[in-house]
Amino acid sequence: MSIEFRKELFADERDDNLNEIGKPTQRQDMVGHVTGRSPFYDDHLFEGLLHMRCVRSPHHHARIRSIDVSAAASMPGVKRVVLGKDVPRNLNTLLSLLDFGLDDEPLISERKVSYKGEPVAVVIAESEHAARDAVAKVRVDWEVLPHVLDVEEAIVPNAPTVNETYPGNCFIYHGKYTHQKLRYGDVDAAFAQADHVIEGRYQMSPIEQAPTETCGAIAAPENNNRYVCYTSTQALFFSLGTAAKLLDVASNRLHFIGGTVGGGFGGKVDSLHEPMAILGSMLTGRPCKYMFDRAEEMQVGAPRGAERWYVTDGVMNDGRLVARKFVGYFDSGAYTRLSSYAIIKAVGHLPGPYTIPNVYADVYCVFTNRTPATAMRGFGITGVDFAIEAHMDKVAEQIGMDPIEFRILNSYRDGDMKAHRRLAKNTALIECCQVAAEKAKWSLSDQAKRQNSLTGGGGERAQLPNFTKTDENGRVEGFSTGSYAQKNKPGAPAQPPQPNYQPQPAPRPSAPPPAPPTAPPPQTPAAPPPIPRPTTQVQDPFSAPTPTPPNPPQPPAAPPGGAPRRTTRFSSISGLRRR
Amino acid sequence: MPVHVETHANISDAARALSSARDGRFFGGGTLLMRALNEADQSIGTIVRCTDPVLRQVRSEGDRIAIGAGVTMAEIMANRDLAFLAPVARIIGGPAVRSAATVGGNLFAEPPYGDFTTALLALDASVRFAGESGQSTPLQDFLRDRANRRGRVVESVMVPRITDPKALRFVKVTRVKPKGAALMSIAAWLPGSGGRGCRIAYGNMAPTPVRAAAAERALEGASLSEQGIARALQAATEGLTPPTDMFASEWYRREVAPVHLKRLLLGQGQ
Amino acid sequence: MAKKPVQFTLNGSEKATFVEEGQNLLDVLRRGVGDLTPKYGCAQGTCGACTVLIDGEPHLSCLTLAETVEGRSVATVAGLENGAALHPLQEAFMRNFAAQCGYCTPGMLMAAKALLERNPRPTREEVVEAISGNICRCTGYEAIIAAILEAAGSGSAASKGRG
């Protein structure tokens, strides 16, 4: 395989002294890999190792009336059958470590299950076979409950409550809303004046990361009242914090060893194997292993969640996009895991790499009776990018435009304002389109070939909308605004809402209806406020609800003679540096 | 439950042990049974193995060939007399599966497995149980009542001797390349000129491999041309109720069956 | 559960151990005799991470009834090296960056060794077929195929190694 460097692009922005890129450097772990000596977690042998296997729910949604473990506990080789009551602090959410979300998931469920495969008891036995035999002997008396597997069906009134922490089946954003909002300009006004309004619906199924090494951990008592834990985790300190919290021990009593992972792809970020194995070790005083078999990895290993997106574009006859609206639903499965955070990433990414002066998004993190969803490569972005690019093709086709030229025309360029209210820099989509077209022998017009990312941006395209229409849709009470999904705590008064950031004063939206005097229901959808009218003179008629025709972003001019620039490109991978 | 494994040197001893064992299963190559043991399948109590050489033999019996039930897919591929079956054996799993998987085991394989049996069905094969000398059971009858045959030891499978390797055509339709479980497999045996006497079998279009009887009738006397096979393609799934499972829906199977059958009959590349 | 004694050769060395009835070879290699090079990926014959050679043929150790290797010869990656020198396949895998997470690598190497032992000069198609039962989820197939072809080109990959 060869790499082709296109060094003529942005040539004046690099000193081109690449020391590593393009030159093979041997990996330090390669000898271990080709000799089979790389130490994966399961390659640590312990005398007297015990094996843990879960009793799992056969139902999507059911109440546990009782669990009878007597037959299982008396089987040969069985050391212990563990129940939820044995977990010191049996409620957690991974992102609580980042103050992002409420504890909503038990390690071993005690009262009800909300997805097929949810663990309700764990057998610890001398061999894996003995553990499996004992699992088959545990009797659970289930009261099967109605379930909901579709994101939009889950958020209608009277849908079964999947997750008691969020009774409306939506994660609560900023303590206030049933969804994450993006408001930039006024899409409705722009749609009214666009030549075409084109809608699309896109959805992605859950995707299992399917690492070849299944998730697992081995824990054993160590000296000084500590426990050692060998684990396949991709996120050692997340796992350490999670184990310390669920087991209610100081993290310095846990000695985590990881780093050699047999494929993760995101699916080993929020595994719960470490607390389970350590709990087994605490209860038996013996080394314990808890690992998924392949069927568990596929059925209950957290996948990339399903997503559904509705995308509506307002576009002019000449191909300029004037508005884009998203309504998105992430299927979080039964518990929060990482989907709520993925949505923050997704919304920050909208409307994709295009300069569009009016953008709107409502994105919901929805709880359904499906396997909890987590990270997978590019999580939060991959799904909506699929929706955006599929929609770009659809719009191009409907207005009769070449799909690559349509992208080049609407590409963001250096200096353009993005919907998250930061100026675009280091943009390179136009060049990517041009090179892709060249490689695919796709002919482009001379006009499209002349475009570049360095010129044509900024100026009017750098301006924030003069008016941004906001609303209080999806407002809930009973949660604190102090964090992303805090419930009100006694003595911690709810903070006043943060002002919406607006470049120029605009009428404040009307206040939400007052909370009921007694314990509030978790969700009180507010009626949409009246549409505010702008009172100030607008400079950018395009983003204002005035009767004048919409003015799309200034079409980029042909590039001048390549004015030299000496800024550093590609300086920030995560974008955090700019904050 | 704890599993008991007993090994017999003689096939009649093995057959007796299997018929009297509580929750007994016969061990062929292990590719299916070991998976069940690894999962601690609670329905298995006894494993009966047999090392009798008769199970590994391939021998001529007149115009037919008797393939021992313990012959592996790798051995089929290496046997010159069975060259017509080599392309079928080659698509069973990877090399490591083929050095274990046996002809006899494949007879009992549940969907999505059992592609080799699909080819055997198209060949009008018959099954000989341990202790039977002259007689054998037509494979079609065997499959109709397969669940009840688990308690008996298969000694061999009888197939016609085929010299023209093009007379047996086979396709395994998968979504994963180069190898994956079949959403359907199709075998066609064309013993005469054109469609005369042809036998067509599908895998994964029913709980066991099944014959495409309507398509066979439509091909009788027809030429293997686009026009000649048109009626057979129309009847490709007549009388069948293909399943909807994780590999494909019933609708999809009905839609693509004639497409793949057409390519197979016209000898077009898959 | 009753145990059975089993003797076999592992990478040229005699091994004797007790196995449980119904136990698979992968478990016996890893926990019984301490050869950790074959990996657990599925225990159902779909991933190939546990591939070993038995009397020179590739087998999935997770689907091999342990007691059936009585008197036979088992080869794993642990026997590929010749003293301190890597096997040509191992060197080719290194040169071609044919491992990312490394978990499928032992199975890939043994599948490749089985191929080169019976077919020292395989075509690319034959290489693809030889590893068609081995899954690499890091999507490194091209590098793996290149490594096997390169090792075959060196001509010495088939004969090296113990066991």
Regions found by a protein language model. Give the residues of each.
Chain B
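C-terminal structural segment of proteins
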Residues: 1-270
